[in-house]
């Protein structure tokens, strides 16, 4: 039973990690005019049109 709980926990964290990637723009990608925010830990530099680390 402990193994099942552990596997469920691992799969839940994996699903959350993969879902975050699809809903945001990765570092170094163009961000101006896109309908998505930059990923966590990055911000859109409008003059450079790129997501950069904070």
Curated annotation (Swiss-Prot):
The alphabetical list of record keywords is:
Calcium channel impairing toxin, Disulfide bond, Ion channel impairing toxin, Knottin, Neurotoxin, Secreted, Signal, Toxin, Voltage-gated calcium channel impairing toxin
Q: Which InterPro entries match?
A: Assassin_bug_toxin-like
Q: Where in the cell is it found?
A: Secreted
Q: Is the keyword Nucleotide-binding in the record?
A: no
Q: In which tissues is it expressed?
A: Expressed by the venom gland (posterior main gland) (at protein level).
Key word Magnesium present in the record? no
Q: What does this protein do?
A: Binds reversibly and blocks P/Q-type voltage-gated calcium channels (Cav).
**Principal place where this protein is found?**
secreted
Its family remark reads:
Belongs to the venom Ptu1-like knottin family.
Protein species of origin: Platymeris rhadamanthus
Which Cys-Cys disulphide bridges does the record give?
24-39, 31-44, 38-51
Q: Record's domain comment?
A: The presence of a 'disulfide through disulfide knot' structurally defines this protein as a knottin.
Name of this chain's protein? U-reduvitoxin-Pr1a
User: Which taxonomic lineage is given here?
Assistant: Eukaryota, Metazoa, Ecdysozoa, Arthropoda, Hexapoda
């Amino acid at each position: 039973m402990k193994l099942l709980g552990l596997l469920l926990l691992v799969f839940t964290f994996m699903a959350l990690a993969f879902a975050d990637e699809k809903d945001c723009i990765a570092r170094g990608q163009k961000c101006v005019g896109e309908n998505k925010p930059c990923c966590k830990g990055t911000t859109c530099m409008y003059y450079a049109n790129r997501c950069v680390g904070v």
